[in-house]
């Protein structure tokens, strides 16, 4: 790490999230107790979700509501999660490796339908570690779902073998959504791709609700 005082580099201790949580668990200080209780709660909830998967959906719904998302958006997002799961299951059946290969295929799909790589898309929305899908508009989510479910359906039909064949299928799935995007943009005259992120999108929704409420009052 570079010191702001003399500009020299010095070794710095760093820890992953897992290591950091283990450190917190080992701290004897009473000040660490709230964190330990929180970790215990999260662990209990994770075990409950393993026993009853429906709890995962219910808690995801609650989390999105607390963040200010509309129910319409949440319904689309939860459906998108299911579509994504079906796609990754298909990739697994086709021998695609989790991690890097999943990321590359996802990038191919995103680039094919949106015209941007995942990194470029996140940069457009001012995102860093945040989930791109959590910062999409409803229309963006729907088109991304169309791209992913198209890739899954083509894969099930053609049963591609090897990474490169799956890569071609991913592009074709993305192209299906690209055609839909271009058709919609031709009808509306507006770009489907927006630079707005979750905070900005929620603000727009809030302002619209307030405007409707004032109109009803008048």
Region annotations inferred by a language model:
Residues 5, 15, 19, 25-218:
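Positively charged, phosphate-engaging catalytic surfaces used for nucleic-acid and nucleotide handling
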Residues 1-10:
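Basic, Lys/Arg-rich DNA-contacting stretches centered on the C-terminal catalytic core
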């Amino acid at each position: 790490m570079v010191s702001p005082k003399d500009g020299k580099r010095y070794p710095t201790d760093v820890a992953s999230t897992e290591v950091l949580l283990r450190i917190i668990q080992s701290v004897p200080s009473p000040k660490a107790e709230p964190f330990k209780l929180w970790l215990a709660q999260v662990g209990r909830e994770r075990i409950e979700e393993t026993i009853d998967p429906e709890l995962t959906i219910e808690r995801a719904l609650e989390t999105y509501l607390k963040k200010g998302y509309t129910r319409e958006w949440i319904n689309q997002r939860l459906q998108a999660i299911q579509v994504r799961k079906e796609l990754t299951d298909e990739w697994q059946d086709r021998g695609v490796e989790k991690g890097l290969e999943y990321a590359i295929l996802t990038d191919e799909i995103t680039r094919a339908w949106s015209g941007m790589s995942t990194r470029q898309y996140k940069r457009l929305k001012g995102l860093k570690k945040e989930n791109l899908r959590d910062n999409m508009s409803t229309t963006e989510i729907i088109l991304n779902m169309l791209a992913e479910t198209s890739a899954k359906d083509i894969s099930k039909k053609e049963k591609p073998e090897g990474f490169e064949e799956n890569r071609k299928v991913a592009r074709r799935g993305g192209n299906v959504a690209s055609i839909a995007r271009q058709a919609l943009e031709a009808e509306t005259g507006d770009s489907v791709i927006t630079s707005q992120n979750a905070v900005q999108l929620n603000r727009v929704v809030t302002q619209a609700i307030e405007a409707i409420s004032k109109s009803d009052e008048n």
